[in-house]
C-alpha cells in the first residue's frame, strides 16, 4: 500500500505467512525473506485480483481487500479460507468498504470491488468487534480522504500493533486498543521498519501444555498483559505464576484443580483461540469444569478426538462440560483445525502411552516448529513423514523455502515452496 519498502521483523515461519507472501508476489510485490525478517517492496503493483486458490490458503487473506482497493482503486477476490470452526461471514468487511466508498458486486463466488472516485472517511459502527474488519477498515481508511471513526472496534493487541505499523508508515491513527479508533486519512504513506509483537496465543499454548503435565516453564519475549485473561484461569487450576517485564514463569501442581466456568469473549476476555487447549488441560483436572464458547458456534470439533484419549466431555450447543479424569490413554487421533490440533498435543503429553496425531498440517498455520519447542521442554515428540515413516528433520526452511536465498537477487528468486507431505506427531507421555 505504501509504494515503498517495508521491513518486518519477528515474523514467524508459519504457513499463513507463506500464503501472505505468495499473495504479495502475485500482486507484483518483491518479497525477500531472511530468517524472521521479511522485506516487502510494493513500488510496483501489477494486478488487483487475487486467485481463489491463494485466497483460500488463510482466513486473514480478506485484509488484502482494503490495501488493494486503496492502492489500485479496484479489487477482485473470493471468500477467504482458514480453519472450519464455524460461520465467519465477511459481511462486516464488505459493508465497511461500502461506507468508505467502494462499490461491490458478487458474481459466481467472486467479489468485484471498485471506487467511483476515491476512498473517503466515514463513521462505521461494527455490530461485533471483528478483528479482521477493524484491520481492513484501518488499512483502507489510512489512505482515504477525510476522517474515519470506528465504533465498537476490536481491542486485541494485534490491532494496536497494526496501528503502530501504519503510523510508522505515516498514517494518523489514534485510539487503537480501545473501542473507538480514529483514522485521519493521508495522501502519502511511506516505508518503515516494524517489529511484530510476540504471539500471545503461542505463549498461552505452551503455558497450558506445561500445566496439563504438571510441569514448569519460563517463557521470555512475551507480554504478560496480553494474556491477562488466561493467568487467572491457570491460577484457579492451582498453578503458581510469576511475571516480570517480558517474562512469565509457571509451576503446575501434580494434579490440577477444576475451573468452575470459562466464557470466551472478545479481547480482553478469555480468547477463543485458547479454548480448545485449556479444555484439554481441564480433562485431567480434579473435578468438573465448564466452558462456554461465545465466539464461534463450531469450535468443539476436537472434543470427539479428545474422547478417544479417554477425556470425559459432553457438549450441548456452545457449552462443554468437562469431568476431569486422573489419566488419559494414548490413541490415534486426527487434528481438526489449528487450535484443536494443539489441544490434542496437550492431551497426548498428559496421557499414558503413545499418541499419534494426523492432520498436523493445521499446526503449521500458527506454530513454528512446535516439536522442537516441546523437545526443549522435555517432551518425547517426533514429527515424521507420513509417506515413509522417517523423522522430519526441519519443519520449516526459512530462507530456503521462501524469499531470497543467500547470493540470489530478488528478481531471480523463484518459488521454492515444496509440496509438504502429510505428517504427524508421535507423542509419548511428557511427565
PLM regions: where:
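Short, structured segments at the rim of ligand-binding sites
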Residues: 1-403, 425-431
Amino acid at each position: 500500500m505504501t509504494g515503498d519498502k517495508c521491513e518486518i521483523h519477528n515474523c514467524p515461519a508459519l504457513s499463513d505467512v507463506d500464503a501472505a507472501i505468495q499473495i504479495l508476489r502475485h500482486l507484483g510485490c518483491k518479497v525477500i525473506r531472511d530468517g524472521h525478517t521479511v522485506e516487502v517492496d510494493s513500488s510496483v503493483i501489477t494486478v488487483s485480483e487475487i486467485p481463489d486458490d491463494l485466497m483460500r490458503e488463510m482466513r486473514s487473506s480478506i485484509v488484502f481487500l482494503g490495501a488493494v482497493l486503496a492502492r489500485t482503486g479496484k479489487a477482485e477476490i473470493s471468500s477467504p479460507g482458514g480453519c472450519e470452526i464455524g460461520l465467519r461471514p465477511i459481511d462486516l468487511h464488505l459493508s465497511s468498504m461500502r461506507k468508505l466508498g467502494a462499490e461491490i458486486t458478487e458474481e459466481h463466488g467472486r467479489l468485484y470491488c471498485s471506487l467511483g472516485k476515491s476512498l473517503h472517511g466515514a463513521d462505521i459502527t461494527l455490530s461485533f468487534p471483528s478483528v479482521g474488519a477493524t484491520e481492513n477498515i484501518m488499512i483502507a481508511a489510512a489512505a482515504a480522504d477525510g476522517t474515519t471513526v470506528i465504533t465498537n472496534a476490536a481491542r486485541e493487541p494485534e490491532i494496536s500493533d497494526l496501528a503502530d505499523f501504519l503510523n510508522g508508515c505515516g498514517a494518523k491513527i489514534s485510539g487503537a486498543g480501545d473501542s473507538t479508533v480514529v483514522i485521519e486519512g493521508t495522501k502519502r504513506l511511506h516505508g518503515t521498519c516494524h517489529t511484530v509483537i510476540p504471539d500471545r496465543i503461542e505463549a498461552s499454548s505452551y503455558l497450558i501444555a506445561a500445566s496439563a503435565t504438571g510441569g514448569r516453564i519460563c517463557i521470555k519475549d512475551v507480554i504478560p498483559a496480553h494474556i491477562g485473561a488466561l493467568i487467572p484461569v491457570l491460577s484457579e487450576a492451582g498453578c503458581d505464576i510469576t511475571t516480570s517485564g517480558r517474562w512469565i514463569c509457571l509451576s503446575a501442581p501434580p494434579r490440577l484443580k477444576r475451573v468452575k466456568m470459562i466464557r470466551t469473549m472478545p479481547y480482553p476476555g478469555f480468547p477463543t483461540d485458547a479454548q480448545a487447549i485449556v479444555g484439554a488441560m481441564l480433562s485431567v483436572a480434579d473435578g468438573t469444569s465448564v466452558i462456554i464458547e461465545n465466539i464461534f458456534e463450531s469450535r468443539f470439533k476436537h472434543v470427539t478426538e479428545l474422547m478417544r484419549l479417554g477425556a470425559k466431555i459432553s457438549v450441548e450447543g456452545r457449552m462443554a462440560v468437562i469431568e476431569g479424569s486422573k489419566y488419559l490413554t494414548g490413541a490415534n487421533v486426527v487434528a481438526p483445525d489449528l487450535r484443536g490440533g494443539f489441544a490434542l498435543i496437550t492431551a497426548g503429553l498428559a496421557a499414558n502411552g503413545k499418541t499419534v496425531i494426523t492432520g498436523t498440517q493445521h499446526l503449521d498455520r500458527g506454530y513454528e516448529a512446535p516439536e522442537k519447542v516441546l523437545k526443549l521442554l522435555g517432551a518425547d515428540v517426533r514429527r515424521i513423514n507420513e509417506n515413509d515413516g522417517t523423522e522430519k528433520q526441519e519443519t520449516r526452511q526459512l530462507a530456503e523455502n521462501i524469499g531470497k536465498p543467500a547470493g540470489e537477487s530478488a528478481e531471480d528468486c523463484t518459488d521454492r515452496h515444496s509440496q509438504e507431505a502429510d505428517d504427524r506427531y508421535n507423542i509419548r507421555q511428557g511427565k
